[in-house]
Amino acid sequence: KHVLLLDSDDAYLPDSVSLLVETAERNKAQMVSFNFETLFPDGSIGERPVEYSFPDVKTSTGHECVEYIYAEHIGYFSWAFMYDRQFLVDLHILYPQGFALLEDALFLNKILRQCSRVAYVSKPCYRYRITEGSLSKRTSLATVDSAFKSLSEIQRIAHSEGSSIRFDAHIVRLYLYIYT
């Protein structure tokens, strides 16, 4: 009934999945955005790598959720959402293939614009492990080219709806991310 994504070196925190399912069903949400904690290579646990605090709301539209991403309250992590399976099937939006970087951003930009209700869980439900040599830390010409393709498609999607000032600032940060 629900779909969760899990990176191979990450983990869901105890009782999180039941909390997410309960939240989705109580709010009749097509997606649930949830908070997470970060496990660093030295073993310490810290804040999530997102600039501002997690949104203090119970539900929103998908468009409002996109604005939370642009304002850096939510990160571009597809694993930080739970999806209603039937919603995914009905949309026919597949996870982008052939992208080495920013595929999460492209997927979320497409799917959130089709989502009428997103619920939020501010309690950390996921442990995101930062590892040395991860794919997101590797820079090659193919990786950069892939990221540019993702960003180009995201810009096309946003501009077709009329992009916001927040989007413009956000896309600049994403371009800078490619180079760091």
Give the location of each predicted region.
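Non-catalytic, C-terminal membrane-associated alpha-helical segments of glycosyltransferases
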Residues: 169-180
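Flexible helix-coil transition and linker loops at the boundaries of alpha-helical arrays
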Residues: 160-168
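Alpha-helix N-cap/helix-initiation sites
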Residues: 101, 168-169
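Nucleotide-sugar donor-binding/catalytic module of glycosyltransferases
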Residues: 1-161
